[in-house]
Amino acid sequence: MASLSRVLRVAATCPRGRAAWNLGLQPLATEARPTTEKSVPYQRTLKEEAQGASVVPQGPSQPLPSTANVVVIGGGSLGCQTLYHLAKLGVGGAVLLERERLTSGTTWHTAGLLWQLRPSDVEVELLAHTRQVVSRDLEEETGLHTGWIQNGGLFIASNQQRLNEYKRLMSLGKAYGIESHVLSPAETKSLYPLMNVDDLYGTLYVPQDGTMDPAGTCTTLTRAAVARGAQVIENCAVTGIRVRTDDFGVRRVAAVETEHGSIQTPCVVNCAGVWASKVGRMAGVKVPLVAMHHAYVVTERIEGIQNMPNVRDHDASVYLRLQGDALSVGGYEANPIFWEEVSDKFAFGLFDLDWDVFTQHIEGAINRVPVLEKTGIKSTVCGPESFTPDHKPLMGEAPELRGFFLGCGFNSAGMMLGGGCGQELAHWIVHGRPEKDMYSYDIRRFHHSLTDHTRWIRERSHESYAKNYSVVFPHDEPLAGRNMRRDPLHEELLGQGCVFQERQGWERPGWFNPQETAQVLDYDYYGAYGNQAHKDYTYSRLLGDEYTFDFPPHHHMIQKECLACRGAAAVFNMSYFGKFYLLGVDARKAADWLFSADVNRPPGSTVYTCMLNQRGGTESDLTVSRLAPGTQASPLVPAFEGDCYYLAVGGAVAQHNWSHINTVLQDQEFRCQLMDSSEDLGMLSIQGPASRDILQDVLDADLSNEAFPFSTHQLVRAAGHLVRAIRLSFVGELGWELHVPRASCLPVYRAVMAAGARHGLVNAGYRAIDSLSIEKGYRHWHADLRPDDSPLEAGLAFTCKLKTSVPFLGREALEKQRATGLRRRLICLTVEEEVPMFGLEAIWRNGQVVGHVRRADFGFTVNKTIAYGYIRDPSGGPVSLDFVKNGEYALERMGVTYAAQVHLKSPFDPDNKRVKGIY
């Protein structure tokens, strides 16, 4: 039997593109022969795609029902978990259709690893539920063992930044009661004697991590689901999705078609894995994912490896999974092989392993566990996996088709995320929204212009695959799929040193570096596939400089922008914002129902408000301006009958807002429409004590407090161009937003800059907004304000019209919450020591962990680190203001605690004078 070291020698001498097994290493090839590997649930012939399909039994495993409440397509991990959780929620008439047999496609050959700690609180919760389902719930319900093995997990750090990341994970784990330990190299050696620790800085050990058996888990899931009335039908390929259009012109799912008949249903769940895009096309739904080859090898027996924890050596981009008395070795490479033509006939097929691609993982594995150099290879597994543009799954209801849900694109994490995601998807289907904040997985996180853009999907999916094991730094940005959407000021700001961030395809200003130009170049695939890697790439170098959990090297440049805004004025290009018009005969009714605040004030008023879901969770925060009819239609005042409201929403979440509003309009059958003018209008925000003096030279309007109060808007002329000026602030200063027709953006910007030159006006970006807004206590949606947070918990009760009798979406939930008391509450904490924090730090109160930080940044005006997070009472009681005030607090950063002071109001300008122009 060939050893791993021989593979390295052969690969080193083998010409590029030539198969290593042509040199006589037949045992290393995935040839067509029977296999009975433990990880393979069925005795099949493993073949390349070109060698043909496995034999498929004729006819479905049981008769098709004529109707179903829900049809799940795909019998892999997500399909089985979703069916199980639908059944647990009491959904009758739930049917799972599998083209071949359960686990076919990807699930059957997955490694089945479960790691409990990830740099996301929501993912930690999802993983915890999966672990509970496979390690306890299923066995209690069915009496069957799922194949769960708890052997622990070990993360390897071979540099200080990686160890810092692990310390952050350890602190987050304390908020969830997850046991973990940061070990020294010597302690690691004691735990794992076969490991080379000479190059280690340390490790993170999580004793209760483990592995799952895909076949055992899926079999047990479906048995439990069937016991609750669900149906599982194998050998039944879906051939089409029938769609109907209702009386309001809304497309809805009507039926699922198969070769053996159709099933009428209002709801379809696409859990088809690498075939999900094809299923989406059947219904006219865009599914942005790509299929790639993903591989691991299984070694021969290794003496002394039994009971060792699974290992992730992130810096070597390799994992080592315990498999009895052997190891599975796999990882993520910079040059994965795309599966260009996804075959329908590949249910239990495997590809031949490309040793040129896989060799790098062997090198990393041998370095970490040297005994592998002399260990033989028992088998290779190279199968298809689906990957997405941001390495997050695709879930939720498709914006193109009501009743069509996604549960696909799991980036090799479908087993470990399956339980949590299956539960949330079931809630999504039954209740309209998930229980947790699933925005990072929601298909609506992508702008509709990107979800069928082939180049963008391919580039971003490649980069997310290649960086799967990279450290997750706070200020990282993608290099792939850039320059998709640029506003009219892009080139102007680039020439002034703007370092851009990417959000929903938009290039938005991050911060300014006047010393050099940082153009974002076309994606080079990190030099893979014959591409020439960029040299002297300024933008990439600036990003790399910020790869730290300390204060970044450009910290002082963000400081200059912030202090200029507080002391004089700054201009923020916010043109990437979503800008919608809600108009029509029922627009007022829709506004009453959609918005938590009373927006039905006289035309000329602007209101900060939230949009809620049925459970009272916050789906959005935004500003709504009521408009008066114009004399003629324009980008600033569309023609309308009835009422019209102008909505300005964060650009990073604009598609989510658009979809949420349209869903509510459809459900309530309001006779109004939502018009998207995001590309037609730019947006400049001029903020600071000098903003009035600057703009008074540019605008033809009286900007005094009496003539132009806070939270009002007017149509004015700026340097001769008609604009909408709104007196608002995202940073806690006197200031105005200018909403400008696209063609006028550049001349208006130049006029503002010219007028501001003598007042000290500077360009500033979103890094400055992050710091300035946290000082003032303004919320950021999807950070300290999410769909699982109510406005009452978040300190935003003032945005809710609870003192009126006007019904609005989520009102009943808020009234119930107010009556029973808040079980958690958002608090503000500051740390006297100058220490960087970015979120996920544990919050200690009186010696107990009571929560974790959602959002943190450094406040340059107060010269302190500021953190916001939700806390609970460990006894389970309501969290009152007295509970908040009467505690001693500390924040744990990377295992070190820092004393913290709690604030009931924002630490900067708590009396709210500056936005009123009182300095």
From Swiss-Prot:
Protein name: Sarcosine dehydrogenase, mitochondrial
Protein EC: 1.5.8.3
Catalytic activity field: (6S)-5,6,7,8-tetrahydrofolyl-(gamma-L-Glu)(n) + sarcosine + oxidized [electron-transfer flavoprotein] + H(+) = (6R)-5,10-methylenetetrahydrofolyl-(gamma-L-Glu)(n) + reduced [electron-transfer flavoprotein] + glycine
SUPFAM superfamilies given in the database record: Aminomethyltransferase beta-barrel domain, FAD-linked reductases, C-terminal domain, FAD/NAD(P)-binding domain, Folate-binding domain
Enzyme class of the recorded protein, top EC level: oxidoreductase
Broad class of where this protein is predominantly found: mitochondrion
Transit peptide boundaries: 1-22
Gene: Sardh
